[in-house]
Swiss-Prot record:
Source organism (scientific name): Acidiphilium cryptum (strain JF-5)
Annotated gene: argH
Catalytic reaction(s) noted: 2-(N(omega)-L-arginino)succinate = fumarate + L-arginine
Organism lineage string: Bacteria, Pseudomonadati, Pseudomonadota, Alphaproteobacteria, Acetobacterales
Similarity comment: family membership: Belongs to the lyase 1 family. Argininosuccinate lyase subfamily.
Electron transport found in the keyword field: no
Identification of the protein by name: Argininosuccinate lyase
HAMAP family named in the record: Arg_succ_lyase
Length: 471
């Protein structure tokens, strides 16, 4: 537990960037609540990248010497190597990643290191670092979403004609194909990629040079640093530059919708693997057992993917709550922006990997799915369509007639395809033997040839298009 004694001395003010006007250092509890190095050390690559771009611009504008720039570059390269190999010691007393790196730099190269922060504040520095990190995370996650889409498209092509029940209200509705069902998730994930791309496009402006909130008196070239860091342009307003966390919120929003899609699919995997359904079997690689029941094979990977969606939703609502009452410009509340973003990105990365593995690994029970697809009068809509198309009944009348025929079949314990013609004709005398041509599940799926329908040829073409797009 943290000692809350206010009289316990913490870091000496001389060690802190802002210590000049303070006679005493912060209390230990203040130091503990103020430090972010425990989590923002993940920004070390981006912090060094931003500092290299800033130093290059300062030298190009004659604000620091070429010799100082060279020393800064060498020192930052040494720091990067030390962090990468694990020999760099992060000091909580130095609060954050920015101060830790700068303190190490000054200790190694002296006065040149003190010049690096010219025309820069930690406010625009962290905003830049964080945008770079989120941009990298988007690129990485986009690649993972693409891999999951490829796995789904491959399995959809394999099962373009595999018939399964389609559900509404989790009740058997109409026959579809497994390939059609899997491609529905490909479409969802495609929109997720679009949202991530939109978020990336909007975040790709560089706040570096906004300084604390009002800009700087030095003749800097913000376009130069923006270009060096791969941004499209500098941000337009210095106050907005350091106050904005829309990019993080939009990222979390996109991840939340993605996580919702993954959670829905995970729920279906859980249902499909359950004993009453038995549509698919997951391999041992993605299931676990019970400590007491030897027979159990639990779909824990899917259950955890479903659960982690809640963490991602919580990250979004948590950061919205942090930001909702903050006046411009920067407030220390904004230090709480990173952990939810890091946690959500980590959870999404793990869920995508698990879902991709399960999709590639799952073993559908084709015969079981086909058997269930033919039950519960799943071709009743086809009967109603027949009455409209072949007998000229208005659809509402056909719907009513079909309902009566379903009741007759149900009372006899028969599916529609097995119901005698004479029984159907008692309800609608004009029905002929041709009705049986539309009542099989094969006929049902084959007849749905309209754009986006479940006909196997449609599904095969759609799967092939996605495979080509994602290749």
């Amino acid at each position: 537990m943290t000692n809350s004694g206010a009289d316990q001395a913490g870091t000496q003010p001389s060690r802190l960037q802002w210590g000049g006007r303070f006679a005493a250092g912060p209390a230990s509890v203040m130091q503990a609540i103020n430090a972010s190095i425990g989590f923002d050390q993940r920004l070390w690559r981006e912090d060094i990248e931003g500092s290299l771009a800033h130093a290059g611009m300062l030298a190009a504008m004659g604000i620091i010497s070429a010799e100082d720039e060279a020393a800064i570059r060498a020192g930052l390269a040494e720091i990067a190597e030390a962090i990468a190999e694990g020999s760099f010691t992060f000091d909580p007393a130095l609060e954050d990643i920015h101060t830790n790196i700068e303190a190490w730099l000054v200790a190694r190269i002296g006065e040149a290191g003190r010049r690096l922060h010219t025309a820069r504040s930690r406010n625009d520095q962290v905003a830049t670092d964080f945008r770079l990190w989120v941009r990298n995370a988007i690129d990485s996650l986009d690649g993972q979403v693409r891999e999951l889409m490829r796995a789904l498209a491959d399995r959809a092509a394999e099962h373009a004609a595999t018939i399964m029940p389609g559900f509404t209200h989790l009740q058997t509705a109409q026959p579809v194909t497994l390939g059609h069902h899997l491609l529905a998730y490909v479409e969802m994930l495609s929109r997720d990629r679009g949202r991530l791309a939109d978020a990336r496009r909007r975040l790709n402006e560089c706040p570096l040079g906004a300084a604390a909130l009002a800009g700087t008196t030095f003749p800097i070239d913000r376009s130069m640093t923006a270009a060096a860091l791969g941004f499209d342009r500098p941000t337009a307003n210095s106050l907005d530059s350091v106050s904005d966390r829309d990019f993080a919120l939009e990222f979390l929003s996109a991840l939340s919708i993605l996580a919702m899609h993954l959670s829905r699919f995970a729920e279906e995997i859980i249902i499909w693997t359950s004993a009453p359904y038995r549509f698919i079997r997951l391999s041992d690689a993605y299931t676990t057992g019970s400590s007491i029941m030897p027979q159990k094979r639990n779909p824990d990977a899917a259950e955890l993917a479903r659960a982690k969606a809640g963490r991602i939703f919580g990250a979004l609502t948590g950061l919205l709550a942090v930001m909702k009452g903050l006046p411009l410009a920067y407030a220390k509340d904004m230090q709480e922006d990173k952990e939810p973003v890091f946690d959500a990105a980590d959870a999404a990365e793990l869920c995508l990997a698990a879902m991709t593995g399960m999709v590639r690994d799952m073993m559908p029970d084709v015969l079981r799915m086909r058997s269930v697809a033919g039950a519960d009068f799943s071709t009743a809509t086809d009967l109603a369509d027949y009455l409209v198309r072949d007998l000229g009944l208005p659809f509402r009348t056909a719907h009513h007639v079909t309902g009566r025929i379903v009741s007759e079949a149900e009372s006899r314990g028969l599916e529609l395809v097995a119901l005698p013609l004479s029984v159907m004709q008692e309800v609608e005398p004009r029905i002929t033997e041709a009705v049986y041509d539309v009542l099989t599940i094969e006929a049902s799926v084959a007849a749905r040839r309209t754009l986006g329908g479940t006909a196997p040829d449609n599904v095969a073409r759609a799967a092939a298009r996605w495979q080509e797009t994602l290749a």
